[in-house]
Amino acid sequence: MSLMQFSGLLVVWLLSTLFIATLTWFEFRRVRFNFNVFFSLLFLLTFFFGFPLTSVLVFRFDVGVAPPEILLQALLSAACFYGVYYVTYKTRLRKRVVDVPRKPLFTMNRVETHLTWVILMGIALVSVAIFFMHNGFLLFRLHSYSQIFSSEVSGVALKRFFYFFIPAMLVVYFLRQDSKAWLFFLVSTVAFGLLTYMIVGGTRANIIIAFAIFLFIGIIRGWISLWMLAAAGVLGIVGMFWLALKRYGLNVSGDEAFYTFLYLTRDTFSPWENLALLLQNYHNIEFQGLAPIVRDFYVFIPTWLWPGRPSIVLNSANYFTWEVLNNHSGLAISPTLIGSLVVMGGALFIPLGAIVVGMIIKWFDWLYELGNREPNRYKAAILHSFCFGAIFNMIVLAREGLDSFVSRVVFFLVVFGASLLVAKLLFWLFDSAGLIHKRTTSLPQAQVEGKL
């Protein structure tokens, strides 16, 4: 890459970043937080944060990358995607009507709410315990991260249930919403994330998500400022780099440490070059249509229920890894949101996907606002826990693609909804057995004596 080509890419990158950052800033000033703000920051991180890192790798370490015209296509496609997404998000198909009283779809009381978070926590802890009994601490047993996906590890499906510890702790926080509950959420979820990191053998998702939710709650409540958020972001990047070194068993120093930091940070937070690789091999892609979305559900179907279930799931990530990169190491490489759309339907699917994503984020914001307006604090805690708990799925959406997002959000919805139903059933059983008693508030002693 010549300096002239780099200068052209830099101009496009600056304009695109300024465009998205400006819209995000105006939205932040208007509402302080909604899921449009979160997705916009996540989109910036995924598709634009990596460009400076790539530039340093190219000019400092002479790392090979896709041709400049392909990198330009990747930047422009990301900017155009966001433009279509933003217009879709802001477009109203019907006029806003004044809220009229409607019969609520469901209600929650104190006992049901506490039962819900206990059930969610129980699902996570029992899954971790069973996985640990089968495998022990994989971080200290395995020699490479790819072994996590090998036949040496049993009960891999249980990892999907670990995440429900975070929604459980979110319910606990939203019932109190004070600084102590906020700090308790951070300590409990990060401690659980570190435990799963050691047990699973290097999975950092629970730690990243817990820390991100903690920061956004702090922004909403005004407990942290923007400069504190930026400082926490830098700390998070350094922390994730250290965990990555431990995960891959790397011992580096000097220039090698700087080089490793650059490419691991890029691959962790901003795999935008994967989109460029897909565009570079565009003519070799056999468009998969909507099949990757259907195939991604296969992993949730146990083999005893479907004995003939394919052992290899060809979703967009695996198609990109195996067919485009010809990589059969056992790891699935993230194609990114736009990359998954390219795999499914080529360039035509990019604006269509942007429209779909705009509607998805709009739905989450509607649910979030519903929780903000809800007078029943127990129901509001459940709604907010569901919305913030889905942040993991939005990260999957930006990094892994639309197919992975759909399957995971449906799975999250089913498990979360089932926990609600079980909590309501248990409450009904306890109430029928006469075990539920209404709380009575006793008068202060002075008032009691005055009434005697």
Swiss-Prot record:
It comes from the Bacteria. It comes from Salmonella newport (strain SL254). One of its GO terms (biological process) is enterobacterial common antigen biosynthetic process. This is Probable ECA polymerase. The chain crosses the membrane at residues 6-26, 37-57, 63-83, 118-138, 155-175, 181-201, 207-227, 228-248, 341-361, 378-398, 410-430. The keyword Cell membrane applies. Keywords: Cell inner membrane, Cell membrane, Membrane, Transmembrane, Transmembrane helix. Probably part of a complex composed of WzxE, WzyE and WzzE. GO terms for cellular component: plasma membrane. Probably involved in the polymerization of enterobacterial common antigen (ECA) trisaccharide repeat units. Signal peptide: none annotated. The gene is wzyE. Belongs to the WzyE family. Its main location: membrane. It is a multi-pass membrane protein. Pathway: Bacterial outer membrane biogenesis; enterobacterial common antigen biosynthesis. It is found in: Cell inner membrane.
